């Protein structure tokens, strides 16, 4: 069976601890957070066997995942900044050099194709700016919620809509505490290297 537990530790960031408990070789099932009391009852006689390599592998995957989320956010931020800069250039009024006897209110004559091109460019710049701002909001929220896929986002939004409580601050049983302690110990030793 797979146990999916979430626990705050070491500088108050959450990490998803995945450990495999061998209760029955033929039966493997992923438990959700709402199944937590059932997991504790079922897994009392099981001993989690997690090697330091698995923990290190998990921590590396977690760091890659967070780096990917950060890269997405900063990529869309750079896109937004570029489109905002283009939109600013489009909004600057065209300066027309005046002749000696020309009135200040006389406008420059433009062809229809030039006007259509400037309108199309302005529309594209405004669309890019709007998409960039919404993209920054979405990727920033996903980065802060630690969401990397649409399925995870759906689960997170369902939890928030149902007001389910998170078990991060609840006391753990002895074996789960051993797993968390081994993760903390391995994480601290990997920082010292």
UniProtKB/Swiss-Prot annotation:
Localization: Mitochondrion membrane
Domain of life: Eukaryota
Note: Present with 623 molecules/cell in log phase SD medium.
Membrane topology annotation: Single-pass membrane protein
Organism from which the protein derives: Saccharomyces cerevisiae (strain ATCC 204508 / S288c) (Baker's yeast)
Gene Ontology CC, one term: mitochondrial membrane
Entry keyword annotation includes Plastid: no
Coarse class of the protein's main subcellular location: mitochondrion
Protein name (database record): Uncharacterized protein YBL059W
Keywords: Membrane, Mitochondrion, Transmembrane, Transmembrane helix
Ranges that cross the membrane: 119-143
């Amino acid at each position: 069976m797979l146990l999916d537990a979430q626990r705050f530790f070491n500088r108050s960031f959450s990490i998803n601890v995945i450990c495999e408990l061998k209760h029955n070789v033929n039966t493997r099932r992923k438990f959700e957070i709402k199944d937590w009391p059932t997991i504790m009852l079922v897994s009392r006689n099981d001993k989690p066997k997690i090697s330091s390599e698995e923990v290190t592998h998990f921590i590396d995957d977690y760091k890659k995942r967070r780096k990917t989320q950060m890269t997405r956010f900063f990529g869309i931020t750079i896109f937004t900044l570029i489109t905002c800069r283009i939109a600013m250039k489009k909004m600057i009024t065209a300066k027309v050099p005046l002749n000696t006897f020309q009135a200040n209110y006389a406008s420059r004559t433009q062809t229809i194709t030039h006007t259509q091109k400037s309108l199309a460019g302005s529309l594209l710049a405004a669309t890019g700016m709007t998409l960039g701002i919404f993209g920054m909001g979405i990727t920033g929220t996903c980065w802060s919620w630690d969401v990397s896929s649409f399925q995870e986002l759906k689960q997170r939004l369902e939890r928030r809509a149902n007001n389910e409580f998170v078990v991060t601050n609840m006391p753990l049983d002895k074996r789960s505490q051993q797993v968390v302690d081994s993760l903390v110990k391995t994480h601290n030793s990997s920082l010292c290297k």
